[in-house]
Amino acid sequence: MATQSVEDSSRSGPRRTNVGSLLKPLNSEYGKVAPGWGTTPLMGVAMALFAIFLSIILEIYNSSVLLDGILMN
């Protein structure tokens, strides 16, 4: 016979590993959403600070090598 059937008793379940045991609590929180705004204001502050950082970097970049001979007000 070309195909061979495997008995259900010979199949093993999922293996348990140390890493899996450590990560299981994180996976059990999947799909749960904290009520209210949560950490949204903190994320807004972080985004604002990052935007300021990017604008400072852009200012430094624009006034450096590329525009050496150009006077800007």
Swiss-Prot record:
InterPro entries, A to Z: PSII_PsbH, PSII_PsbH_sf
Pfam (any one): PsbH
Phosphoprotein as UniProt keyword: yes
GO molecular function list: phosphate ion binding
SUPFAM superfamilies, per database record: Photosystem II 10 kDa phosphoprotein PsbH
Ranges for region Disordered: 1-22
Membrane topology label: Single-pass membrane protein
Record flagged with keyword Kinase: no
UniProt KW keywords: Chloroplast, Membrane, Phosphoprotein, Photosynthesis, Photosystem II, Plastid, Thylakoid, Transmembrane, Transmembrane helix
One term under GO cellular component: photosystem II
Phosphothreonine PTM positions: 3
Post-translational modification, as annotated: Phosphorylation is a light-dependent reaction catalyzed by a membrane-bound kinase; phosphorylation occurs on Thr residue(s) in the N-terminus of the protein.
Subcellular location as annotated: Plastid, Chloroplast thylakoid membrane
GO biological process, one term: protein stabilization
Spans traversing the lipid bilayer: 41-61
Location, primary (coarse class): plastid
Subunit structure: PSII is composed of 1 copy each of membrane proteins PsbA, PsbB, PsbC, PsbD, PsbE, PsbF, PsbH, PsbI, PsbJ, PsbK, PsbL, PsbM, PsbT, PsbX, PsbY, PsbZ, Psb30/Ycf12, at least 3 peripheral proteins of the oxygen-evolving complex and a large number of cofactors. It forms dimeric complexes.
UniProt family annotation: Belongs to the PsbH family.
Primary role: One of the components of the core complex of photosystem II (PSII), required for its stability and/or assembly. PSII is a light-driven water:plastoquinone oxidoreductase that uses light energy to abstract electrons from H(2)O, generating O(2) and a proton gradient subsequently used for ATP formation. It consists of a core antenna complex that captures photons, and an electron transfer chain that converts photonic excitation into a charge separation.
UniProt cross-references to HAMAP family, sorted A to Z: PSII_PsbH
The protein's name in its UniProt record: Photosystem II reaction center protein H
UniProt source species: Pelargonium hortorum
